[in-house]
């Protein structure tokens, strides 16, 4: 069996401060939150590199705004997705729980919907095609996914099912059994492998929506597969047939829709063209 590396989920404890004689406890900074920050920084760096390619519609000067829109989509969509897809009962009992993000609870599928909405707004603002923008963003998403799963691993959350295989790991929060380190499986597949494939695939001009649809297909397949060794949410369990999880139910439409779009993209190919930066002459601000 593998041994958990005993990483403290709290990266930095800020302690407390005294203001006008009153002690205020400052929040701890967790590795999970830092992984989001590292992910956005790396997305900006890789996006800046990719923006220099002539077949991408995004200009380097857009990256700060673009990453901000993506970040808002991830955080707001991820939180709303978790509440409505995975724990709607808790929301009905306490609607304000939706806003207590620090208590945990984020959903990739909700984050994806949030990013899609954010990119619709940004595409309209910058006067570019929405699908061209999604093709640019898609290869950046696995960076955040992989780092987020590492954050889950450090926090000992979203672990795998019990196993007797040598790859099983004993987590200190549940020392009685060995489990699949499914967070690391997801970090490898949804993070490293997905990034490598999409980065390579998008390095040349591809038909409009081909890159984004390939992301949907591959992520859906990877997530569906890993769900077989990932522990279902305790308050949900299995949804259908006694074995299908909520994550698999949400991933199946991604695979189907992605495959249909990918087929259509190559059947009726159209290619993005890089237009002049509308902000270069000051016509766009912000």
From Swiss-Prot:
A 1,2-diacyl-sn-glycero-3-phospho-(1'-sn-glycerol) binds at residue 149. PANTHER family: PHOSPHATIDYLGLYCEROL--PROLIPOPROTEIN DIACYLGLYCERYL TRANSFERASE, PROLIPOPROTEIN DIACYLGLYCERYL TRANSFERASE. The keyword Membrane applies. It comes from Teredinibacter turnerae (strain ATCC 39867 / T7901). NCBIfam families: lgt (TIGR00544). The chain crosses the membrane at residues 29-49, 66-86, 101-121, 130-150, 181-201, 209-229, 250-270. Belongs to the Lgt family. It is a multi-pass membrane protein. GO terms for molecular function: phosphatidylglycerol-prolipoprotein diacylglyceryl transferase activity. This is Phosphatidylglycerol--prolipoprotein diacylglyceryl transferase. It is found in: Cell inner membrane. Keywords: Cell inner membrane, Cell membrane, Membrane, Transferase, Transmembrane, Transmembrane helix. The gene is lgt. Its EC number is 2.5.1.145. Catalyzes the transfer of the diacylglyceryl group from phosphatidylglycerol to the sulfhydryl group of the N-terminal cysteine of a prolipoprotein, the first step in the formation of mature lipoproteins.
